[in-house]
Structure formats: C-alpha cells, structure tokens
Amino acid sequence: MNEEKAVVVFSGGQDSTTCLFWAKKQFAEVEAVTFDYGQRHRREIEVAASIADELGVRHTVLDMSLLGQLAPNALTRGEIAIEQKEGELPTTFVDGRNLLFLSFAAVLAKQRGARHIVTGVCETDFSGYPDCRDIFIKSLNVTLNLAMDYPFVIHTPLMWLTKAETWKLADELGALEFVRTKTLTCYNGVIADGCGECPACVLRKRGLEEYLQEKAGVKAR
C-alpha cells in the first residue's frame, strides 16, 4: 500500500464508487470530493454523502453551480431531452466538467497534503465525451503540475476497462453487491439498477450481465 493520501472525484455512481474502493486499497488515507453543479436530481449528492459515511471516508461537497449556468445540458435542465444525434455529442455532455472538477480537486488535494487524484473516467466505453480521453487526462496532469508547482498524479483505474471489466474489478475488491445496490448511475435518479432505460442504465446493465455470464462460465468449467 502507498502510504500517501489520495482524493477521489466522487459522484456516488458505479464508476467513482469502484474507484473509491480501489483507492482505499492503494493509499493509506483517502478523501472524496463531490461537486454540486445543479444536477437535475439531488439524490446524487445525498447518495455520495451516504456512501462516504458508510465507508468512513472524509467527504467534501463543493459548489459548482456556475457550471450549470454556463453550460446548459440534459443533466442540469429537465426540459432538455437525454439524446444523442448523429455526429453530435450527447446532450448529457457538460462542457468543461472534468476540466473544472479535476482542477478543483487538485486545489483541495494540495491543501490536504495529498498529491494523488483518482477519477473514474473511461475511454473504452467512450460516449463521445472528449474530457474522458486518456490524452486529456495526461495533458491536464502536466498542466496542473505546472500551474501549482506540485507533483500531482492523476489515476484513472477504469480508463481501459469495459463496463463488464469494471464490474469485475468491483468484485475483486469485494464490493460487487455494494456497488450494485447502493450506487446511483441513473440519469433519472433511481438508485441501484436504475430506470433501465436511460443510456447510463443500459450501459451499466449490459456490463453487469456480461460479467455475470463470464463469471458463471468460469465457475462451470
């Protein structure tokens, strides 16, 4: 285990909760930071706080409501439909979100004496979000180090994993049922298996089914 501290960018969803369990295995001290950017469902912040409390992790919520004013999108405006038109980014994409979240997480991390930042962004199940790409994370890591003259390391344990492989990682961390029943991935604010219809729920369900089938096949051999 690394004896240093880490800050996890935390939404209370499948990916960031898996990352929180991963970080607790990797680092001696872990803190979670959640951003309030005017999400259409407030349960995300409540779920994140509940999970952090249950896992005994210090939790900070930062006000990023300005982001919702600057970048109207389906995650902050109920009147905007969740959809993706051919050749366009999904309406769930929030311009600048990961750029700002990671920048503010870095400021918090430095104040806490932590240099490790963990985020659940993933390029494999790429939804067209440019700020989930590995090249962006590496670029921002360099920029933050130069901007604050501090040796940050941004960790992306899910970057090259499919959703099925992310479920597998949660299982290996002993957190499969926890992640399955207590996290909030659904764009419509439904905990656990969600609404089953929004893009986030469909991706989550398909990944879980693929992993459970694979796991059953391995056991049957």
Curated annotation (Swiss-Prot):
UniProt cross-references to Pfam families, sorted A to Z: QueC (PF06508)
EC main group: ligase
Cofactor(s) of this protein: Zn(2+)
Residues annotated for Zn(2+) binding in this entry: 186, 195, 198, 201
Keyword ATP-binding recorded: yes
EC number: 6.3.4.20
This protein's UniProt keywords: ATP-binding, Ligase, Metal-binding, Nucleotide-binding, Queuosine biosynthesis, Zinc
CDD domains in UniProt: QueC-like (cd01995)
Origin superkingdom: Bacteria
Reaction(s) this enzyme catalyzes, per UniProt: 7-carboxy-7-deazaguanine + NH4(+) + ATP = 7-cyano-7-deazaguanine + ADP + phosphate + H2O + H(+)
Residues spanning the signal sequence: none
List of residues binding ATP: 10-20
GO BP term (any one): queuosine biosynthetic process
Biological or metabolic pathway of the protein: Purine metabolism; 7-cyano-7-deazaguanine biosynthesis
Molecular-function GO terms, alphabetical: ATP binding; ligase activity, forming carbon-nitrogen bonds; zinc ion binding
Entry's cofactor comment: Binds 1 zinc ion per subunit.
Coiled coil (UniProt feature): none
Keyword Transport annotated: no
PANTHER family the UniProt entry points to: 7-CYANO-7-DEAZAGUANINE SYNTHASE
Subunit structure: Homodimer.
Family recorded in the similarity comment: Belongs to the QueC family.
Protein role: Catalyzes the ATP-dependent conversion of 7-carboxy-7-deazaguanine (CDG) to 7-cyano-7-deazaguanine (preQ(0)).
Name recorded for this polypeptide: 7-cyano-7-deazaguanine synthase
Organism, as annotated: Geobacillus thermodenitrificans (strain NG80-2)
Lineage start: Bacteria, Bacillati, Bacillota, Bacilli, Bacillales
This protein's encoding gene: queC
